Amino acid sequence: MSNAETRPPLPPFTRESAIVKVRLAEDGWNGRDPEKVSLAYTLDTKWRNRVEFANNREEAKGFLTRKWAKELDYRLIKELWAFTDNRIAVRYAYEWHDDSGNWFRSYGNENWEFAENGLMANRFACINDMPIKESERKFHWPLGRRPDDHPGLSDLGL
């Protein structure tokens, strides 16, 4: 296994390493770079995102490209829900707007399963979109990584 194929922290997870893994995933997705994000997944990764399926890394990259072309000014917060050995469950919320300026807060849960090298092999996501007014937004940091001092989901009452 080369370093390029390793994505620490590696399973089996502790509470601390699972929290780090979740934050790294959040940071990656907030970067909105499909090529870079896709490298966190195995070549044969399996995804279900809402009703869309991806059966490998290339399909996942295509999904991410379409997603971030539609979901503009995307800002995401993830929170650890549960973990064991090579699996992590998260809950999350993200805010975005469409090309007509309509704002949404999307709430979701994901189940992740990791290969021994720390790459994600399976990702199963359930997500609901809630229309919000721009004045109801809670995520206002500059695009990119959420600042360390920004409240998390529980702190925001979400």
Regions found by a protein language model. Name each.
Residues S17, P34-I88:
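A solvent-exposed, acidic/Ser-Thr-rich amphipathic alpha-helical stretch
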Residues V22, Y41, L64, Y92-Y94, ...:
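Hydrophobic alpha-helical core bundles mediating ligand binding, dimerization, or RNAP-core interactions
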Residues S2-F13, W68-L158:
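A beta-strand edge to alpha-helix "cap/lid" segment located at domain peripheries
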Residues M1-L43, L153-L158:
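Short, low-complexity N-terminal intrinsically disordered segments enriched in polar/charged residues
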Residues V20, L24-D27, L39, G62, ...:
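Charged/polar, solvent-exposed surface patches and flexible loops
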